[in-house]
């Protein structure tokens, strides 16, 4: 699993923000802005993209020649107009899966990515974790501990204009002035590596 929000040079990532000082978090905003551009580029909206029925557990034959579109508005509060939450100390991050040619999820419900504080103390300080994705993209995203990469986006076969599914993670109002460690993992895929990062809002 790949955690997307900045150039990652090691296995542990720190998001550090000084509240109200944009220079301290513009690097994260810029990285997220660049990420969402692949979904907003009109040239990407070709005949090979289609609207998908995410309530169906059946693998459609068309998946092998086309791919599902991903509506960037599904990011809900994690959007450009809100500067991805960094202005009000509720930073957003993006979780994606690496593209593996021909791979299919074992579960017909897709792949779940779950996140929580790394320790009980972190869980007390973390505030609220909200997951916005193709299935849930409103306040209900704050009532769960996992987001979903729907199975309809797989397999990846180098389709034209393929748009990988994303899960937008909002860390809503975490405790300030303390380092908070967060772990994310794939819930229904054993033997996959966890992603760990930390947030510090001064």
Language-model features and meaning:
Residues 166-202:
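Compact beta-sheet-dominated globular domain cores
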Residues 37, 48, 77-79, 102-106, ...:
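An almost-null, non-specific background feature
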Residues 91, 163-166:
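Glycine-rich, often proline-containing surface loops adjacent to acidic residues and nearby aromatics
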Residues 124-164:
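Extended, solvent-exposed segments with strong compositional bias
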Residues 2-132:
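Intrinsically disordered, low-complexity juxtamembrane tails/stalks of eukaryotic membrane proteins
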Residues 88, 162, 175-177:
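Surface-exposed coil/turn segments at beta-strand junctions on protein surfaces, enriched
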Residues 78-82, 153-155, 168-170:
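Eukaryotic intrinsically disordered and solvent-exposed regulatory patches
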């Amino acid at each position: 699993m790949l955690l997307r929000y900045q150039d990652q040079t090691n296995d542990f990532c720190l998001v550090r923000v000084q509240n109200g000082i944009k220079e301290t978090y513009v690097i994260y905003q810029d990285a997220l802005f660049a990420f969402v551009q692949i979904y907003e580029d009109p040239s990407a909206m070709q005949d090979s993209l289609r609207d998908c029925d995410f309530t169906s557990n059946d693998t459609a034959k068309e998946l092998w020649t086309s791919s599902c579109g991903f509506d960037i508005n599904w990011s809900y509060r994690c959007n450009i107009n809100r500067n991805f939450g960094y202005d009000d100390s509720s930073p957003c991050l993006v979780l994606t899966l690496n593209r593996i040619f021909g791979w299919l999820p074992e579960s017909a419900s897709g792949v779940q990515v779950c996140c929580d504080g790394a320790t009980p103390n972190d869980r007390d300080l973390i505030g609220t974790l909200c997951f916005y994705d193709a299935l849930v993209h409103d306040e209900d995203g704050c009532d769960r501990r996992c987001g979903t990469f729907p199975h309809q986006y797989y397999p990846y076969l180098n389709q034209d204009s393929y748009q990988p599914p994303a899960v937008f993670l909002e860390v809503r109002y975490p405790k300030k002035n303390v380092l908070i460690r967060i772990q994310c993992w794939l819930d229904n895929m054993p033997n996959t590596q966890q992603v760990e990062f930390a947030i510090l809002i001064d």
